[in-house]
Every structure is written in C-alpha cells, then in structure tokens.
C-alpha cells in the first residue's frame, strides 16, 4: 500500500472531523469555537454544513442531558471555504427544561450566519396541541 492510500480518509471521516469543531473558549456569556469547511466546487461554504456546525457549537455550551429542540438560521453572506469559521455562541437563557443559544458565524468579511438554537431536557416531553386522531 502506498503512503497516500494509508493516510487517505473517507468522506464520512472528513465530515465527522469538520463537525467536531475546535475547543471552546469562554468569555462572559459568550463561547467561541473555531471550525473549518468541507470542499465545495463553488468555493463557497455549503449552508447545510455551517448550520450543522452552528448546532454543534451551541451544543458544546449546554449539559449533555439537553437535546436539540430547534434551530432557526439566517444566512447573511456567502462564506469562503479557504477561511476558517468562528462560531460565537451567546448564552441567552438556561431554564429548568430549556436552554436557548444565539450563534453568530463569522469570517474575515463579517457575519455569514446568525441562528438561534433551543435545547430541551431529555425525558421532558413538550405540550401537544394536536387533537387525537379520529377512529
């Protein structure tokens, strides 16, 4: 086997590495996490990747018992795959059942995504508003 074949990683391994992000650094109510991008033919950051990374960055700031409940994101500008991403996670609220985080993703040119993520304590089902199914 050649040296290149021994060190090659699969696309799934590359994706898992990109979603791990860097080590969080906290200052006041903000946590900063660095990330990188997958290759994309246009040279721009793929939106699905950056929203997944935003959720992963936010999840680093809540207890493991809190699971993702929702995320709402707004793409502000195109990202460049040649530049690292900086995830600024702001702690908006930690309640008994829910946690809320705002994530601002930036590169050298400014914001590329802003999102709000919600997490719910595991095992605490929410209120159901739907009527029961007819028989």
What do these predicted ranges mean?
Residues 1-135:
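Terminal targeting signals and extreme-terminal segments of soluble enzymes
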């Amino acid at each position: 086997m050649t040296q290149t074949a021994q060190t090659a990683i699969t696309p799934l391994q590359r994706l898992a590495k990109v979603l791990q992000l860097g080590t969080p650094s906290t200052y006041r109510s903000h946590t900063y996490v660095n990330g990188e991008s997958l290759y994309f033919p246009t040279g721009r950051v793929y939106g699905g990747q950056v929203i997944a990374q935003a959720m992963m960055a936010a999840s680093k700031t809540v207890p493991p018992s809190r699971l993702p409940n929702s995320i709402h994101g707004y793409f502000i500008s195109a990202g460049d795959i040649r530049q690292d991403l900086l995830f600024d996670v702001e702690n908006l609220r930690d309640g008994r059942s829910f946690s809320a985080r705002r994530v601002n993703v930036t590169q050298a040119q400014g914001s590329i995504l802003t999102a709000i993520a919600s997490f719910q304590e595991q095992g605490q089902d929410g209120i159901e508003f739907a009527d029961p199914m007819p028989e």
